[in-house]
């Protein structure tokens, strides 16, 4: 912290001055010595021999200047790095002090009790919860400062590597042995990358690499995770094939040859994956300059695009190469995408889009390239395309652009795509084939479409896929492109004939998560009372109301696709729960003093949507083909999903964090779920819980409970009087009439009359 970093800039000035002096000496030598052998007064063998020696000396003067300038540049680079890191460390120390911490000269963090008031100090001594919160805070600050100190150490090691390398004469043909370095470079990261490449290449070749060298490779990845020069220099040296072979070797070591150091090898994969992510960044957005557009081609043709173009061309070549055996193949793309899954960095949208296109082209050219033959390769997921889609889900904007049915770019730069159609309807999804002595047994991959489901959820919502325990909020803002994706999903999943919309089991929950975030729109569509949705359903599939984008699909298509999603009870529960929350919020938005008509319209619409849900629920239960669930199990799973976390949800967890809501806003749905939860039996008693679910999912009971909770909070309805009770009964009746309308309409869409 007290080191005088100005010494680095002073030294840099000195080396720059030395380069200038060497330049003067070069000119003098060239004029007064080297020139003698070039004239006509000295001829013959001795002149030729002298000329060769003079040439070497002249080159050494030139190389010495190059080396001196490079050292000066490295010193300035080191100064910039150390000054930045020291500034961050000082800022962290000051932040810790501001948070009532002490930081010693050795970087040890402790709680500064001397700054506390006497009452606070007393509370700290006697309150275990207070003490635990302090311990957590101390650990947090200690971790932050330790990491910053480690960053300084990492940077210092990188500087050491650069200064050791810059003075090495790498040209064996310049006439000297260990002379000045005419190839010296003034960038620390380039030397770190070259050193890392040398270690990585030996590792990829299966050669001996020491523990110290592995630690150095890990440090280089860690220290340069955000440096494009390092990333591109390293990957240019390794090339796609070297990167693939290195991945395979790291997997072999982690899962087979050296299992006790598995964590280290996986961490190295993470560093390599982060390097790929940084090196393949493309300026701008795929929505503006999509693959194949003139704007993208112009960038590729420039200096900045040269690395990317060469890398992608070579990846295309080696991605389709088999690095395994004929009976147990392992294709380059499979290894490369599995490597990408280790990254903690968001991949560029253009890179993901192009790689997705390349993977589709590869499997169209060579069928079954992504199938699994025999035992799974450790650390490798055979279906590289589905694996890439899972990675894409972590960049929702990239996923939206990849699936947008309208394509990307504008004017002459517009490029369409059919990814949604291909992946939902046309692709023959890879299977798992296991050879036996008498036959080959082929089964479906149990993880098939997991990546697709995550990517579609991200694409249609603009958010990361929801995790277990997270609820979709029923009214989220969406872009036009996201609404087009959601509309496109429904269009691709709707049945071409009959009433069945078969949805793969691994797509049901993620698509329900996505659709539930359009509940404000599905509520209107199922309610059947807004002409805007009817008009837009057969047009663009969305419409705008001011700054708000709305999804529009036909009522029939929506009901049939929701029926397909509802084969999974959790998916059905997700949709029903979101709808219940939206109805509750809509009821709360009815102004006090509203007329009966102003109240009955939204309540009738609410009833119609619940009627559609009733028809869908009955359709699933009465389907003899219902796979994997008995009727009782299906209903019980719905129950546990809906009541779980629904009671007084003061903060609804979402993909982006959480949305805080008031207790009163969801009081109706909370009361309903709370009563339901109190009625539930032990989880193993599925038949009993199924009967309870029937009672609470019955629209009469659900809406009566929600309306009662809503009415009790209103000043314009006195539910203790006969008049108030009559008004509540009339409103409940409006809902139930709407329920019959919605149920009858949905049943019509779910009844196959072709037989």
Regions found by a protein language model. Give the residues of each.
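N-terminal secretion-targeting helices of virulence/extracellular proteins
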Residues: 1-172, 208, 745-755
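Alpha-helical rod/repeat scaffolding segments in eukaryotic adaptors/tethers
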Residues: 40-43, 47, 68-71, 127, ...
């Amino acid at each position: 912290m007290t080191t005088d970093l100005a010494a680095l800039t002073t030294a840099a000035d000195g080396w720059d001055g030395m380069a200038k002096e060497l330049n003067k000496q070069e000119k003098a030598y060239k004029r007064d010595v080297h020139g003698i052998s070039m004239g006509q007064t000295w001829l013959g063998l001795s002149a030729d021999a002298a000329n060769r020696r003079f040439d070497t000396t002249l080159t050494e003067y030139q190389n010495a200047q190059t080396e001196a300038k490079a050292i000066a540049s490295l010193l300035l680079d080191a100064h910039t790095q150390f000054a930045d890191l020291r500034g961050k460390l000082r800022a962290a120390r000051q932040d810790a002090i501001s948070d009532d911490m002490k930081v010693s000269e050795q970087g040890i963090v402790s709680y500064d009790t001397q700054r506390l008031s006497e009452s606070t100090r007393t509370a700290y001594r006697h309150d275990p919860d207070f003490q635990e919160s302090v311990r957590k805070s101390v650990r947090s600050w200690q971790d932050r400062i330790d990491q910053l100190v480690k960053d300084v150490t990492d940077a210092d090691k990188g500087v050491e590597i650069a200064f050791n390398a810059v003075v090495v004469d790498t040209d064996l043909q310049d006439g000297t042995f260990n002379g000045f370095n005419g190839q010296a470079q003034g960038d620390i990261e380039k030397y770190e990358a070259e050193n890392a490449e040398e270690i990585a290449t030996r590792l990829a070749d299966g050669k001996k690499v020491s523990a110290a060298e592995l630690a150095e490779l890990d440090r280089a990845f860690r220290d340069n995770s955000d440096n494009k020069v390092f990333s591109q220099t390293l990957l240019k040296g390794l090339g796609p094939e070297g990167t693939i072979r290195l991945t395979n070797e790291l997997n072999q070591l982690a899962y087979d040859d050296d299992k006790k150091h598995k964590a280290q090898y996986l961490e190295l994969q993470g560093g390599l994956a982060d390097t790929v992510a940084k090196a393949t960044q493309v300026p701008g957005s795929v929505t503006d300059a999509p693959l194949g557009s003139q704007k993208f081609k112009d960038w590729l043709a420039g200096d900045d695009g040269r690395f990317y173009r060469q890398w992608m061309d070579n990846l295309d070549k080696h991605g389709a190469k088999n690095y395994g055996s004929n009976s147990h193949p392992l294709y380059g793309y499979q290894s490369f995408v599995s490597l990408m899954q280790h990254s903690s960095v968001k991949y560029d949208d253009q890179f993901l889009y192009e790689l997705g296109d390349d993977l589709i082209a590869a499997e169209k050219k060579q069928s079954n390239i992504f199938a699994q033959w025999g035992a799974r390769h450790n650390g490798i997921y055979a279906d590289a395309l589905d694996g890439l889609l899972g990675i894409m889900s972590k960049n929702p904007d990239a996923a939206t652009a990849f699936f947008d049915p309208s394509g990307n770019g504008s004017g002459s730069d517009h490029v369409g795509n059919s990814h949604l159609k291909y992946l939902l309807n046309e692709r023959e999804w890879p299977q798992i084939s296991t050879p036996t002595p008498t036959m080959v047994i082929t089964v479906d991959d149990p993880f098939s479409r997991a990546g697709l489901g995550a990517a579609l959820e991200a694409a249609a919502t603009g958010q990361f896929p929801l995790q277990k325990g997270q609820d979709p909020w029923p009214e989220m803002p969406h872009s036009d492109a996201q609404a087009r994706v959601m509309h496109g999903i429904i269009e691709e999943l709707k049945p071409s004939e009959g009433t069945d919309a078969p949805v793969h089991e691994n797509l049901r929950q993620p698509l329900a998560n996505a659709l539930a975030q359009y509940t404000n729109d599905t509520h209107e569509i199922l309610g059947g009372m807004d002409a805007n949705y009817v008009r837009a359903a057969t047009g663009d599939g969305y419409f705008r109301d001011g700054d708000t984008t709305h999804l529009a699909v036909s009522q029939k298509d929506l009901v049939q696709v929701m029926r397909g999603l509802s084969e999974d009870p959790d998916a059905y529960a997700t949709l029903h729960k979101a709808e219940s929350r939206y109805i509750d919020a809509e009821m709360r938005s009815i102004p006090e003093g509203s007329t009966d008509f102003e109240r009955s319209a939204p309540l009738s619409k609410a009833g119609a949507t619940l009627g559609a849900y009733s028809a869908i629920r009955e359709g699933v239960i009465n389907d003899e083909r219902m796979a994997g669930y008995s009727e009782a199990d299906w209903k019980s799973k719905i129950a546990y999903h809906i009541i779980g976390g629904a009671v007084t949800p003061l903060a609804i967890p979402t993909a982006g964090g959480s949305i805080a809501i008031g207790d009163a806003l969801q009081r109706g749905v909370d009361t309903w779920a709370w009563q339901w939860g109190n009625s539930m039996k032990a989880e193993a008693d599925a038949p009993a819980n199924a009967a309870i679910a029937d009672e609470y999912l019955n629209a009469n009971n659900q809406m009566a409970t929600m309306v009662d909770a809503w009415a009790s909070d209103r000043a314009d309805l006195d539910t203790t009087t006969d008049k108030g009770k009559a008004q509540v009964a009339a409103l409940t009746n409006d809902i139930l009439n709407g329920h019959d309308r919605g149920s009858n309409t949905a049943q019509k869409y779910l009844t196959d009359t072709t037989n």
